[in-house]
Structures are given as C-alpha cells and as structure tokens.
Curated annotation (Swiss-Prot):
This is Spheniscin-2. SUPFAM superfamilies: Defensin-like. InterPro entries: Defensin_beta-like. Disulfide bonds join C5-C33, C12-C27, C17-C34. It is found in: Secreted. Pfam families: Defensin_beta. Secreted into the stomach cavity. Keywords: Antibiotic, Antimicrobial, Defensin, Disulfide bond, Fungicide, Secreted. Monomer. It comes from the Eukaryota. GO terms for cellular component: extracellular region. GO terms for biological process: defense response to bacterium; defense response to fungus; killing of cells of another organism.
Length: 38
C-alpha cells in the first residue's frame, strides 16, 4: 500500500522502477513501490 511504501522510504512509480531505483513492493496493482539504490 502507499503508506507502507512511504514507511520503507520508498516512492510509488507507475509501471516500472527506473534506475537508480529498485522495486521493493507494490503500491497498487499497476504501481510499484521503488527505492533509490543511492
């Protein structure tokens, strides 16, 4: 969910996570939770 993604210091990205971020979960069905690698 959006809140959980925020707690894990991630952000919601539609479709795919773009470099330099990696997927760490989901915000919704078509939205991934991403986190920057650096």
């Amino acid at each position: 969910s959006f809140g959980l993604c925020r707690l894990r210091r991630g952000f919601c990205a539609r479709g795919r996570c773009r470099f330099p971020s990696i997927p760490i979960g989901r915000c919704s069905r078509f939205v991934q939770c991403c986190r920057r690698v650096w």
